[in-house]
């Protein structure tokens, strides 16, 4: 039985999140040899070259407006998002960043309403958002950490979520060009790579070439560059085209879930009751927020209760 285009979009989003949720393991290994900005630059260089090798077709320049959208997407989704998130990690706890960045679906829904004139998010969306954020909080704090606010770092993490929302909206606008999304993703990477160059001088870029070819580092760089960047961004951008930015962004809720499960499987970290409860709550939040999944409303429950109470004995 063949998948419908919509079902394929959901499957693609899920597979992308499964890969993105495990990238922290590779990043953790690479941080022993490289700085965050070095990992970022090498990762997207490999990503761009991978797309160029597999899809060498040239994407012609058509309109200045198109190039501005590509540049905006590269600046937001490639350069600023990762840089702001990394800077936030130096000013606040990683657990805080994990929760704040998960607000991206909320910002995406609001921007889609204001910018794309889509339907205003309703009570069901906010209920799902609340459940997912509560679940993510249980996962990242894991019953061991008390919330400790750090205004600068927390604001930067929220800014990173907003930046990703901007990227999602720009990606949807780019999808409207009706061009090959892989080629569009490559053009986005190109601009993101260009915008990243000034940051290299700001944060320092002095990678040791020999360390890049150590087998463990090479494996993780290729995983991040080819798998988590070239493949996942191309698939994610196609998913935004199929499902729309809001519905696609909801899958971001699952990143902490995949992270905690992969930690248990790969790093043998203990899966606590708080993490299990958080996983269930996060999944519930995703299902509640999913508009196309019909859940029984108040009238349905009233009707069922009425039938039960009026049933003859």
Residue ranges and their predicted role:
Residues 33, 91, 118, 177-178, ...:
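Helix-loop interface residues and adjacent transmembrane-helix termini in multi-pass membrane transporters
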């Amino acid at each position: 039985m063949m998948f419908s285009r919509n079902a394929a979009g959901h499957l693609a989003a899920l597979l992308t999140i499964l890969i993105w949720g495990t990238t922290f393991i590779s990043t953790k290994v690479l941080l022993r040899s490289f700085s965050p900005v070095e990992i970022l630059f090498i990762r997207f260089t490999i990503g761009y070259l991978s797309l160029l090798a597999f899809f060498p077709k040239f994407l012609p320049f058509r309109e200045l407006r198109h190039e501005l959208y590509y540049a905006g997407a590269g600046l937001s989704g490639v350069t600023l998002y990762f840089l702001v998130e990394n800077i936030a990690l130096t000013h606040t706890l990683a657990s805080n960043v994990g929760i704040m960045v998960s607000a991206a679906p909320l910002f995406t829904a609001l921007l889609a309403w204001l910018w794309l004139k889509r339907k205003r998010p309703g009570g069901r969306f906010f209920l799902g958002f609340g459940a997912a954020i509560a679940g993510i909080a249980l996962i990242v704090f894991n019953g061991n950490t008390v919330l400790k606010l750090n205004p600068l770092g927390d604001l930067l993490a929220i800014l990173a979520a907003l930046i990703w929302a901007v990227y999602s909206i720009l990606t949807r606008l780019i999808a409207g060009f009706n061009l090959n999304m892989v080629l569009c993703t490559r053009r986005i990477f190109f601009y993101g790579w260009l915008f990243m160059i000034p940051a290299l001088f700001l944060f320092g870029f002095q990678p040791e070439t020999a360390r890049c070819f150590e087998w463990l580092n090479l494996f993780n760089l290729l995983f991040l560059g080819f798998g988590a960047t070239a493949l996942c961004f191309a698939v994610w951008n196609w998913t935004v085209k199929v499902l729309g930015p809001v519905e696609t962004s909801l899958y971001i809720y699952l990143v902490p879930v995949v992270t905690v499960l992969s930690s248990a499987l790969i790093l043998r970290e203990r899966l606590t009751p708080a993490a299990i409860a958080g996983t269930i709550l996060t999944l519930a939040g995703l299902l509640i927020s999913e508009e196309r999944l019909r859940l029984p409303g108040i009238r349905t429950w009233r009707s069922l209760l009425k039938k039960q109470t009026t049933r003859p004995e």
